[in-house]
Every structure is written in structure tokens, then in C-alpha cells.
Amino acid sequence: MELQLAIDLLNKEEAAELANKVKDYVDIVEIGTPIVINEGLPAVQYLNDNIDGVKVLADLKIMDAADYEVSQAVKFGADVVTILGVAEDASIKGAVEEAHKNGKELLVDMIAVQDLQKRAKELDELGADYIAVHTGYDLQAEGESPLESLRQVKSVINNSKVAVIGGIKPDTIKEVVAEEPDLVVVGGGIANADDPVAAAKACKDAIEGR
């Protein structure tokens, strides 16, 4: 089971500084969509140039022109790129092919997908490396949790890894870990903590059963 740090609300320099503080406890560091919107793909390159020992994920939430957009993210140092599960099959297929051609991985974000099990099965067959159940910021505010979605997706896939995103914190991660996802994504639970290093360590300890 891997741990990913999602960084959304910092600039690229602050993101790299935070990532380096916690890199001993995380496997993947995400340059979140807000950073990409504010600073572009050079933010991905900046992180890649300033950290060792972790994979860098570019959260582009691709919807169309997928092979081109994946190729650009890879060019700027991304190891993992995200596409939306509601994208057309042709877009998913193009993204998978482009990522794999370059030895990189594709994470499919299931935010706003209505029939989770049907789409997860299709994405599994299309070759997605990760299928991520995602309770977005707006639904988190309404008290929703990704755990039931995680169970639904896990029950129908054979090849893809399952990731879980949305409101996970050090004090709630154990209930997520109990569902045995392959990747747990924590954002503000680490980034906004008074002590991000301690928060990252607590998350990693939970994943490793300590």
C-alpha cells in the first residue's frame, strides 16, 4: 500500500519544500490541479528537479486530447498523470498508450462517475494503472466519505490498482487502510497540519500497521 501527498494550495517552491520534508514517509507527491492552473507544467518539472526517491504525479484531470496532454506532462517530469473517468473510452485508451509508451502510469479519477462499478470494470479492461475513488471538496463539505465507493470498485476490478482520495487525515486513515486500497491519497491532512512531518509519519505508520 502506497501513500501519496496531494499538494494543492502552495506555489511550486513551497510544494517542493514541503515534499522534501516528508519524502521519507510518502511514495508519490502530487502537484495538484490548482498549482497546474496557477503555474503550469513547469511546476511539475520544478518538483521533479528538486526531489529524489518519490514519484511525481501531475493532477491534470484530462478530459480530451489525452495522448497529447499525457505526453506534455511526461515531458515535464511526471511519473503518473490523471485523467477523468467520465472521459471517452478513446481518450482513456490514448492516455494509457502514451503513458505506457514512456514507462509512466495513468491514474483515472472517478469523480462525478455515476455508475462506479460499470465504469471501473471498463477502465480496468482499458488498462488503467490506478482507478481512484474520489470524494471531492464540495461533497466532503456535505459529509460524504469515499469508503463505500472504494468497496464497490474493489469488487469488480482484476488488474488496476485502487486509490482513494478525499478528506483523509491521520486520525481517519486507519478506517481507510482497513479496506485495503493500493494507494491512499492525503492532502490537507498532511499539508495543513501543524507538524506535516509528524502527520506524514502517522499516515505511513497506519499504512504499515504500526
UniProtKB/Swiss-Prot annotation:
Q: Which GO terms describe its molecular function?
A: 3-dehydro-L-gulonate-6-phosphate decarboxylase activity; hexulose-6-phosphate synthase activity; orotidine-5'-phosphate decarboxylase activity
Q: Is Secreted found in the keyword set?
A: no
The protein's superkingdom reads Bacteria
Q: Which Gene3D superfamilies match?
A: Aldolase class I
Listed under catalytic activity are: D-ribulose 5-phosphate + formaldehyde = D-arabino-hex-3-ulose 6-phosphate
Q: Which InterPro entries match?
A: 3-hexulose-6-phosphate_synth (IPR017553), Aldolase_TIM (IPR013785), HPS/KGPDC (IPR041710), OMPdeCOase_dom (IPR001754), RibuloseP-bd_barrel (IPR011060)
**Pathway(s) where this gene product acts:** One-carbon metabolism; formaldehyde assimilation via RuMP pathway; D-fructose 6-phosphate from D-ribulose 5-phosphate and formaldehyde: step 1/2
Q: What class of enzyme is it?
A: lyase
Going by the UniProt record, its keywords in alphabetical order are: Carbohydrate metabolism, Lyase, One-carbon metabolism
* Entry EC number(s): 4.1.2.43
Q: Which SMART domains match?
A: OMPdecase
GO terms (BP aspect): 'de novo' pyrimidine nucleobase biosynthetic process; formaldehyde assimilation via ribulose monophosphate cycle; L-ascorbic acid catabolic process; one-carbon metabolic process
The keyword Lyase is annotated on this UniProt entry: yes
The record's listing under PANTHER family reads: 3-KETO-L-GULONATE-6-PHOSPHATE DECARBOXYLASE SGBH-RELATED
Family in the record? Belongs to the HPS/KGPDC family. HPS subfamily.
- Please describe what this protein does: Catalyzes the condensation of ribulose 5-phosphate with formaldehyde to form 3-hexulose 6-phosphate.
Q: Name the chain's protein.
A: 3-hexulose-6-phosphate synthase 3
Say which species the protein is native to.
Staphylococcus saprophyticus subsp. saprophyticus (strain ATCC 15305 / DSM 20229 / NCIMB 8711 / NCTC 7292 / S-41)
